[in-house]
């Protein structure tokens, strides 16, 4: 019997695309203090830290000019220095990873800044390539990713759902089950939002200058601040799912997926 193929473990894709003319830099916000899973970014998964896996996934994306770890922790800086990774020590006052990306953007010039979450150990170069293909359209100010939502995640509030129009423009992001299947048809296509973002600097500057928005507070989803302020977010689809690690259970699930690849 052939090995089971899941949305986390798919066949290798076609050869990489050529680097475009957009200068893009990935920033990995990396803080040591995490409430639900302390020091999670330095936790080892199958012999490698979470940060190691995320950093090297980003380094494998040929469309990126550079990858920078942005941290408020000297311990993480020391880890990066030992590995020869590019890293910046940033303020410990930031409310979100986006604010940390914004600080880096003030001193490192690029056309596009990509926010790669440090707690996404299943990140792949293909995620970033797909996102940067989207950003080749200069009218796109903010880009992100979606993937078909598995049945186990449709009603899961920790799996954020996204609804888009026919052009890929996001209509809404929610922890609720959207769209709602009023007539119980059972044929609704649900999409899970993946936490990779690409921003052009002027729009990133505006975002960090706005106060927290009403919908953002309600859903605890900062991307809703863009939508409430009239900024379109375009969403590209990828077949590669990921898991954001917030708990020990998430960590074990990732370990199982990685073992299945070996």
Curated annotation (Swiss-Prot):
The keyword Transferase applies. It comes from the Bacteria. Pathway: Nucleotide-sugar biosynthesis; CMP-3-deoxy-D-manno-octulosonate biosynthesis; CMP-3-deoxy-D-manno-octulosonate from 3-deoxy-D-manno-octulosonate and CTP: step 1/1; Bacterial outer membrane biogenesis; lipopolysaccharide biosynthesis. It catalyses: 3-deoxy-alpha-D-manno-oct-2-ulosonate + CTP = CMP-3-deoxy-beta-D-manno-octulosonate + diphosphate. Disulfide bonds: none annotated. The keyword DNA damage does not apply. InterPro entries: Cytidylyl_trans, KdsB, Nucleotide-diphossugar_trans. Transmembrane segments: none annotated. It is found in: Cytoplasm. Its main location: cytoplasm. Keywords: Cytoplasm, Lipopolysaccharide biosynthesis, Nucleotidyltransferase, Transferase. Pfam families: CTP_transf_3. Its EC number is 2.7.7.38. GO terms for biological process: CMP-keto-3-deoxy-D-manno-octulosonic acid biosynthetic process; lipopolysaccharide biosynthetic process. It is an enzyme of class 2 (transferase). GO terms for cellular component: cytosol. One of its GO terms (molecular function) is 3-deoxy-manno-octulosonate cytidylyltransferase activity. Belongs to the KdsB family. HAMAP family: KdsB. Activates KDO (a required 8-carbon sugar) for incorporation into bacterial lipopolysaccharide in Gram-negative bacteria. This is 3-deoxy-manno-octulosonate cytidylyltransferase. It comes from Koribacter versatilis (strain Ellin345).
């Amino acid at each position: 019997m052939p090995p089971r193929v899941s949305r986390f473990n798919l066949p290798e894709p076609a050869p990489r695309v050529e680097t475009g003319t957009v200068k893009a830099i990935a920033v990995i916000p990396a803080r040591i203090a995490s409430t639900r899973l302390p020091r999670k970014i330095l936790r080892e998964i199958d012999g490698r830290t979470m940060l190691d896996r995320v950093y090297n996934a980003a380094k494998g994306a040929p469309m990126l000019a550079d990858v920078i770890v942005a941290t408020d922790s000297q311990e993480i800086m020391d880890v990066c220095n030992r590995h020869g990774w590019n890293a910046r020590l940033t303020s410990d006052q930031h409310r979100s990873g986006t604010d940390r990306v914004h600080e880096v953007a003030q001193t490192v010039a690029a056309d596009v800044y990509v926010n790669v979450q440090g707690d996404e150990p299943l990140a792949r170069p293909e995620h970033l390539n797909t996102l940067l293909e989207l950003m080749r359209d200069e009218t796109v100010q903010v880009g992100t990713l979606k993937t078909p939502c598995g049945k186990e995640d449709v009603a899961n509030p920790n799996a954020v759902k996204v609804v888009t129009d026919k052009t890929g423009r996001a209509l809404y992001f929610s922890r609720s089950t959207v769209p709602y299947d009023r007539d119980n048809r059972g044929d609704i296509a649900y999409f899970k939002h993946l936490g990779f973002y690409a921003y052009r600097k002027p729009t990133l500057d505006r975002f960090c200058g706005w106060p927290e928005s009403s919908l953002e507070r309600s859903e605890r989803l900062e991307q809703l601040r863009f939508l409430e302020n009239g900024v379109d977010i375009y969403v590209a689809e990828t077949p590669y799912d990921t898991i954001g690690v917030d708990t020990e259970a998430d960590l074990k699930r990732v370990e199982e997926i990685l073992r299945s690849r070996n």
